């Protein structure tokens, strides 16, 4: 199926955990819906923290979504009448999402993606840096540091209340029981070498 629209683009919303990425994605989707645009919302199957079927922000705002295991599945859910495609937790998808989202924008869709730009180690996370490079618009949000109240750009993983080691697995789906927002100065990663 080849679908061509008037104009398309890719918007990326990124930042640390608790910075409001999902909330901003939901806000943009609601505005598109108010404008009578047809919207399709997607999230990765791995993200089941708050709901199996919905994109849910940490403050409880939610929106029904299609749960997919691979970005290729997006194509199965869209049609010529679709105007906007929104994808939450984009960092959990493989490299193919970069090409899929770019192709969707090339075909005229407004594509909104949201995800973590850094992992708990403070390093670029998955596909997000490459999406930042190809997006027409990048919005980087900040949370509030749980230690000092300064703007927080990092995600602190905690294990039994202590900072996780650099050697721990990068992906661990969780929320406030496992993570906090931290500023540059209070972000700790034991065993990290500079």
Swiss-Prot record:
The record's annotation in Pfam families points to: TK
Q: Which GO terms describe its molecular function?
A: ATP binding; thymidine kinase activity; zinc ion binding
Q: Where does ATP bind?
A: 15-22, 88-91
Query: What's the catalysed reaction?
Result: thymidine + ATP = dTMP + ADP + H(+)
Please list the GO biological process terms of this entry: DNA biosynthetic process; thymidine metabolic process
Q: The organism sits in which domain of life?
A: Bacteria
Q: Quick one: where is this thing mainly located?
A: cytoplasm
Q: Which UniProt keywords apply?
A: ATP-binding, Cytoplasm, DNA synthesis, Kinase, Metal-binding, Nucleotide-binding, Transferase, Zinc
Q: What class of enzyme is it?
A: transferase
Q: Which HAMAP family match?
A: Thymidine_kinase
NCBIfam families linked? PRK04296.1-1
> Subunit structure, per the record?
Homotetramer.
- The name this protein carries in UniProt is Thymidine kinase
């Amino acid at each position: 199926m080849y679908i061509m629209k008037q104009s398309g683009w890719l918007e990326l919303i990124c930042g640390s955990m608790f910075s409001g990425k999902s909330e901003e994605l939901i806000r943009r989707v609601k505005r598109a819906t108010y404008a009578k645009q047809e919207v399709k919302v997607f999230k990765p199957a791995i993200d089941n923290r708050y709901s199996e079927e919905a994109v849910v922000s940490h403050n409880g705002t939610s929106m029904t979504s299609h749960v997919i295991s691979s970005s290729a599945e997006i194509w199965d859910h869209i049609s010529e009448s679709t105007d906007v495609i929104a994808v939450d937790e984009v960092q959990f998808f493989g490299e193919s999402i970069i090409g899929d989202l770019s192709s969707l924008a090339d075909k005229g869709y407004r594509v909104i993606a949201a995800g973590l730009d850094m992992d708990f180690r403070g390093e670029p996370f998955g596909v997000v840096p490459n999406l930042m490079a190809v997006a027409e618009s990048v919005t980087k949000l900040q949370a509030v540091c749980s230690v000092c109240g300064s703007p927080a750009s990092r995600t602190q993983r905690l294990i039994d209340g202590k900072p996780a080691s650099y050697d721990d697995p990068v992906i661990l789906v969780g929320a406030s029981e496992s993570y906090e927002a931290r500023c540059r100065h209070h972000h700790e990663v034991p065993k990290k070498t500079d």
